[in-house]
Amino acid sequence: MREPAFWRRPSSLLSRLLIPVGALYGAIAARRLSRTGLRAGVPVICVGNYHLGGAGKTPTVLALAGILRSLGETPVVISRGYGGRLRGPVRVDPDRHAAADVGDEPLMMARTLPVIVSRQRAAGVAPARALGASVILMDDGFQNPTLARDISLIVIDGDRGLGNRRIFPAGPLRAPLPPQLARTDALVIVGPGSAADDIAASIEARGGPVLRARVVPDEASVAALRGRRVLAFAGIGDPSRFFRGLRACGVDVAAERAFADHHPFSQRDVAALQSAAEKDGLTLVTTEKDLARLRNNENIAAFAQAVAPFAVTLAFDDETALRSFLMDGIAKVRRLD
């Protein structure tokens, strides 16, 4: 879904009118938060956020997986597979599955680490452990009560923050903020900005670490676009962040096309993008997540060959602190189990 503009405006009349509905939704969500889920038998690290929409969870999961591997762990991801038709549990195979089967984010992650898609997250534990998981990375699911979380890392965009801080549908929050804060073990703030400073202060007051991170563009992706004028398009939680990132790298973005998160690109979309690019001699560029959806759609796979990917990774300002936090947290879980 595309984020409504009023989610960022506390003064919006429509947002205020929806507050009673949000209160009901929030009461149900808060009750779900208090439930205890299945114990996995191995440490479960949840990477989530307080609100609907994108904040950088997938790059965070990939970065954590790399760190965990360097610590000698075997991480396996469990994802709901948003946007996919398969309920699972099923191991994602990039050579066999399409985004329509398992979702674009699991498909992208499965190119570098084992990913289990399971609509019921607890059902994904057995296949994850069968793959040798010593640690489970739960992609999203902070508000889902079916699988017990041992360590919860919340990701927030430093510039966008939490919008108007009202509960869905009056705002982007998935549940009331206080019970979410109380269940947060660490906060990851992606990018510059002060929109989450008060949240950071609250987490620090509870003794949790606040980890700053930044999106780092792949040098080869940037080099391939130098000297070219591009038409950038994206169907992610915050397309504007993608466009800003391109410009920050010196890429000449002549045109932008923003789509809703997880947008299923159609032949009509592809034709319009091709026409616009050809008209002005522009190179098409998109995110790795969007390209995963394009490549695995047999009707438009040929179009994907002409699109340049813009790959990014997440780098933590203090990776040593993160490594210590993960090692201590995992060791504590194992002592208790």
From Swiss-Prot:
GO cellular component terms, semicolon-separated: plasma membrane
Key word Nucleotide-binding present: yes
GO MF annotations in UniProt: ATP binding; tetraacyldisaccharide 4'-kinase activity
Recorded metabolic or biological pathway in which this protein acts: Glycolipid biosynthesis; lipid IV(A) biosynthesis; lipid IV(A) from (3R)-3-hydroxytetradecanoyl-[acyl-carrier-protein] and UDP-N-acetyl-alpha-D-glucosamine: step 6/6
Reaction it catalyzes: a lipid A disaccharide + ATP = a lipid IVA + ADP + H(+)
Entry EC no(s): 2.7.1.130
Pfam families (alphabetical): LpxK
GO biological process: lipid A biosynthetic process; lipopolysaccharide core region biosynthetic process
The entry's keywords: ATP-binding, Kinase, Lipid A biosynthesis, Lipid biosynthesis, Lipid metabolism, Nucleotide-binding, Transferase
Binding site for ATP: 51-58
InterPro entries registered for this protein in UniProt: LpxK, P-loop_NTPase
Function: Transfers the gamma-phosphate of ATP to the 4'-position of a tetraacyldisaccharide 1-phosphate intermediate (termed DS-1-P) to form tetraacyldisaccharide 1,4'-bis-phosphate (lipid IVA).
Family: Belongs to the LpxK family.
Protein name listed in UniProt: Tetraacyldisaccharide 4'-kinase
